[in-house]
Curated annotation (Swiss-Prot):
Belongs to the NDK family. This is Nucleoside diphosphate kinase. It catalyses: a 2'-deoxyribonucleoside 5'-diphosphate + ATP = a 2'-deoxyribonucleoside 5'-triphosphate + ADP; a ribonucleoside 5'-diphosphate + ATP = a ribonucleoside 5'-triphosphate + ADP. Keywords: ATP-binding, Cytoplasm, Kinase, Magnesium, Metal-binding, Nucleotide metabolism, Nucleotide-binding, Phosphoprotein, Transferase. The keyword Magnesium applies. Major role in the synthesis of nucleoside triphosphates other than ATP. The ATP gamma phosphate is transferred to the NDP beta phosphate via a ping-pong mechanism, using a phosphorylated active-site intermediate. Its main location: cytoplasm. GO terms for molecular function: ATP binding; metal ion binding; nucleoside diphosphate kinase activity. It comes from the Bacteria. GO terms for biological process: CTP biosynthetic process; GTP biosynthetic process; UTP biosynthetic process. The keyword Kinase applies.
Length: 142
């Protein structure tokens, strides 16, 4: 397995519940290192740009509305097989279908307010990381 970087968002619902530390602890306990992090209240333009791939989907407006409803925590995580590991830790998109002990099973309320976002592939991770973090803001995790 190779060391990878992945992008993570702790979404407004989880920030509002004050579970940021609990979520980050899950990442770190499972071998993922935080190599970049910032809290930000996304503008509508930032959220629309980030989720542009979903622009023509019926849920796009609700997704953008939710993502601008409060602050988020943007992070770059690094570790062995980081993308798959993060997706396993997050659990299924719908928290009702997420395995017990996953972030979404423990902290998410609904398929919309589902606590976290994580990249799904190396190419996606690279684009998502670059969207919010210039290279100078991402530090070597070794």
């Amino acid at each position: 397995m190779a060391v990878q970087r992945t992008f993570s968002i702790i979404k407004p619902d989880a920030v509002a519940k004050n579970v940021i530390g609990k979520i980050v602890s899950r990442f770190e306990t499972n071998g993922l290192k935080v190599v970049a992090s910032k809290m930000k209240h996304l503008s509508r333009q930032e959220a629309e740009g980030f989720y542009a791939v979903h622009k023509d989907r019926p849920f796009f407006k609700d997704l953008v509305d939710f993502m601008v409803s409060g602050p988020v925590v943007l992070q770059v995580l690094e570790g062995e097989d980081a993308i798959a590991k993060n997706r396993t830790l997050m659990g299924a998109t719908d928290p009702k279908k997420a395995e017990p002990g996953t972030i979404r099973a423990d902290f998410a309320e609904s398929i919309d307010a589902n606590a976290v976002h994580g990249s799904d592939a190396p190419e996606t991770a690279a684009v998502e990381i670059a969207y919010f973090f210039p290279a100078s803001e991402v530090y070597a995790g070794r």
